Amino acid sequence: MRFPRAVLFDLDGTLLDSAPDMLATVNAMLSERGLPCITLAQLRPVVSKGSRAMLAVAFAHLDAAAREALVPEFLKRYEALLGTQAQLFDGVEVMLQRLEQAGCVWGIVTNKPEYLAQLILPQLGWQQRCAVLIGGDTLAERKPHPLPLLVAADRIGVAATQCVYVGDDERDILAARAAGMPSVAALWGYRLGDDDPLSWQADVLVEQPPQLWEPAAWPQP
C-alpha cells in the first residue's frame, strides 16, 4: 500500500471548516437590515453549495432575483472576514504532512472564486506547499464538470488516473468520475439532511481526516 502520486482537494468542507466565517458574513448582513440572525446549524449544511445557497437560507423571505442582488455584498463582506474564524478540520494538517513526506504532490480545486481561495493560502502557510489552485472562476467550467480537475492534474504533471480527488459534495465525486480520477468522499464535510453519500459512488468513503493518515485508506491504482 502507498499514498497516491498526487491528491487534489476541495477546500470548504474538506480541508477547511469555513462555515463560521460564512455565518459571520450572513449574520452581519441580516443584522444591518434589522433581521434576526441564523444559527450555524441552519447554515452549515449548505456551505458547500456556495453563496447563493447560503443567501437562500439567510434571506428565505426574498425571491431569487433579490437574493442574487445580494451576492456582491456577500462576497465583499466575506473577503473582509475571511479566515477570522475558519479552522482546518482536525487531522488535516497531519494528513498533508504525511502526503508530503511520502513525496505526494497536492493541490486544491474549489468552486470558490479563485481570488478568495488565494487569500486563504498565506493564512494557512500553504503558498509553497499547494502545487496548484483552481477556483470556480479560473476556467470556463467548474465542478461538476471535469475540466478543473483535468487542468489541475495537467499543471502538476500527473495523469488524471494517478491523482485522487477528495471532496465533501456529490458534484466533487461526479467531477472526479468524469475526469477518470479516483475519488474519496469526505463525510466530515457539509451535507444536506437528505444527501446520500453512498449513492455518489465514490471509490472510498472516509468519516474523518485521520483515517487518511495511512496509505491503506486511499484508493489504490
UniProtKB/Swiss-Prot annotation:
Which biological pathway?
Organic acid metabolism; glycolate biosynthesis; glycolate from 2-phosphoglycolate: step 1/1
Per the UniProt entry, what is one GO biological process? carbohydrate metabolic process
Which transformation does this protein catalyse, written as a reaction? 2-phosphoglycolate + H2O = glycolate + phosphate
Q: What is this protein called?
A: Phosphoglycolate phosphatase
- Enumerate the UniProt keywords alphabetically: Carbohydrate metabolism, Hydrolase, Magnesium, Metal-binding
Q: Could you tell me the superkingdom of the organism this chain comes from?
A: Bacteria
Which species does this protein come from? Xanthomonas campestris pv. campestris (strain ATCC 33913 / DSM 3586 / NCPPB 528 / LMG 568 / P 25)
Quick one: which gene encodes this? gph
Cofactors required: Mg(2+)
State its Enzyme Commission number(s): 3.1.3.18
Q: Gene Ontology cellular component? A: cytosol
Q: Which Gene3D superfamilies match?
A: HAD superfamily/HAD-like (3.40.50.1000), Putative phosphatase, domain 2 (1.10.150.240)
Q: Which residues bind Mg(2+)?
A: D10, D12, D168
Functional note: Specifically catalyzes the dephosphorylation of 2-phosphoglycolate. Is involved in the dissimilation of the intracellular 2-phosphoglycolate formed during the DNA repair of 3'-phosphoglycolate ends, a major class of DNA lesions induced by oxidative stress.
Please list the residues that make up the active site: D10
* Broad enzyme group: hydrolase
What's this protein's family per the entry? Belongs to the HAD-like hydrolase superfamily. CbbY/CbbZ/Gph/YieH family.
Identify a single GO molecular function assigned to this protein: phosphoglycolate phosphatase activity
